[in-house]
UniProtKB/Swiss-Prot annotation:
Belongs to the glycosyl hydrolase 19 family. Chitinase class I subfamily. This is Probable inactive chitinase-like protein LaCIC. Residues 1-41 form the Chitin-binding type-1 domain. Keywords: Allergen, Chitin-binding, Disulfide bond, Plant defense. The lineage of its organism: Eukaryota, Viridiplantae, Streptophyta, Embryophyta, Tracheophyta. Probable inactive chitinase-like protein that does not exhibit hydrolytic activity toward chitin. May bind chitin and be involved in plant defense against fungal pathogens.
Length: 295
């Protein structure tokens, strides 16, 4: 016997169910009638992946973002595995929803999009253009204040809300909402997203996890929890990685045919899916999708 009263109350590894007879597995015979402990089989309320560290190891993180600490990268030394794992704990469903392949695909998609946003790569870069994600932590062009008049999220005097962090969080209304969710005053302190490495990752994961009408969350799309409406279908928005690009930057990149930025997002995503050994899914681009909010 491996678990339960037959084994001194031991729990099964990996969140598996302990059957009435003291054996570990996650099938109905073990998790059903008589099950002694962990009777959701590791699926739990959030999904089939026990913890994020089992989906993306430190060594995988380092290989995915292998040139982020290059001397030429402005963000060198900023983005760390520990900061990522720490930030993700504030969002228990992130990277842990669905079966293991779904969890891996979500992490590949998150890093695919954020690597594009922070890339330092170029077509002939060492190890290819998709090994240079997370080279930047702030938008290169900081001339714009990204301030949209908002009574709910007023711009602070002298502050700019240009892109910062992995997702390049932009605009006062995003800083305001994100700050509320994280318990931080990001309207007055937007630089925290580029100076505190845990807050930086938290802001990116917050954006990923949070729907903003009429857009679903990136998380719900990649985990298969988003069902397009008839309106979405007529606008070409079908489930897949392409809809996530539409959520993030559809107004500039989607619905107008081929776009190098979209291809770059796809290139990172495919590299990471290949590293995780998972399929890409369908509908990777957004070339025939109307941007959200425009139809």
């Amino acid at each position: 016997e491996q678990c339960g009263r037959q084994a001194g109350g031991a729990l099964c590894p990996g969140g598996l169910c302990c059957s009435q007879y003291g054996w570990c597995a996650n099938t109905p015979e073990y998790c059903g009638s008589g099950c002694q402990s962990q009777c959701d089989g590791g699926v739990g309320g959030e999904g089939g992946c026990v913890d994020l560290g089992s989906i993306i190891s430190r060594s995988t993180f380092e290989e995915m973002l292998k040139h982020r600490n290059n001397a030429a990268c402005p963000a060198k030394g900023f983005y760390t595995y520990d900061a990522f794992i720490s930030a993700a704990k504030a969002f228990p469903a992130f990277g842990t929803t669905g079966d293991v392949d779904t969890c891996k695909r979500e992490i590949a998609a998150f890093f695919g999009q954020t690597s594009h946003a922070t890339t330092g790569g170029w077509p002939t870069a060492p190890d290819g253009p998709y090994a240079w994600g997370y080279c930047h932590k702030e938008e290169l062009n900081q001339a714009s204040s990204y301030c949209s008049p908002s009574p709910a999220y007023p711009c602070a005097p002298g502050k700019k809300y240009y892109g910062r962090g992995p997702i390049q969080l932009s605009w006062n209304y995003n800083y305001g909402q994100c700050g509320q969710a994280l318990g931080l005053d990001l309207l007055n302190n937007p630089d925290l997203v580029a100076t505190d490495r845990v807050i930086s990752f938290k802001a990116a994961i917050w954006f990923w996890m949070t729907p903003q009408f009429p857009k679903p969350s990136c998380h719900d799309v990649i985990t298969g929890q988003w069902s397009p409406t008839g309106h979405d279908i007529s606008a070409g928005r079908a489930p897949g990685y392409g809809v996530i690009t539409n959520i993030i930057n559809g107004g500039l990149e989607c619905g107008s045919g081929w776009d190098a930025r979209v291809e770059d997002r796809i290139g990172f995503y495919k590299r990471y899916c290949d590293m995780f050994g998972v399929g890409y899914g369908s509908n990777l681009d957004c070339y025939n999708q109307t941007p959200f909010g425009l139809g």
